[in-house]
Amino acid sequence: GVPCLCDSDGPSVHGNTLSGTIWLAGCPSGWHNCKAHGPTIGWCCKK
């Protein structure tokens, strides 16, 4: 999947590990939404 920036990763994508994965239809079972605001499309989820 496409990596995304979780709230716990830091304020910006520069120099931070992107620990989330974008899911277009919501987070699958066993995953949770790790970003409070965004992304614009889909959800940023992590295990």
Curated annotation (Swiss-Prot):
Compartments where found: Secreted; Nematocyst
SS bond partners: 4-44, 6-34, 27-45
Entry-linked Pfam families: Toxin_4
Primary residence: secreted
GO biological process: regulation of signal transduction
Gene Ontology CC entries for this record: extracellular region; nematocyst
SUPFAM superfamilies: Defensin-like
Alphabetical list of InterPro entries matching this protein: Anenome_toxin, Myo_ane_neurotoxin_sf
Any one Gene Ontology molecular-function term assigned to this protein's record: toxin activity
Keywords (A to Z) from UniProt: Cardiotoxin, Disulfide bond, Ion channel impairing toxin, Nematocyst, Neurotoxin, Secreted, Toxin, Voltage-gated sodium channel impairing toxin
Protein purpose: Binds specifically to voltage-gated sodium channels (Nav), thereby delaying their inactivation during signal transduction. Has a longer mammalian heart stimulation effect than Hk2a, Hk8a and Hk16a.
Family that this chain belongs to: Belongs to the sea anemone sodium channel inhibitory toxin family. Type I subfamily.
Protein name: Delta-actitoxin-Aspp1b
Native organism taxonomy: Eukaryota, Metazoa, Cnidaria, Anthozoa, Hexacorallia
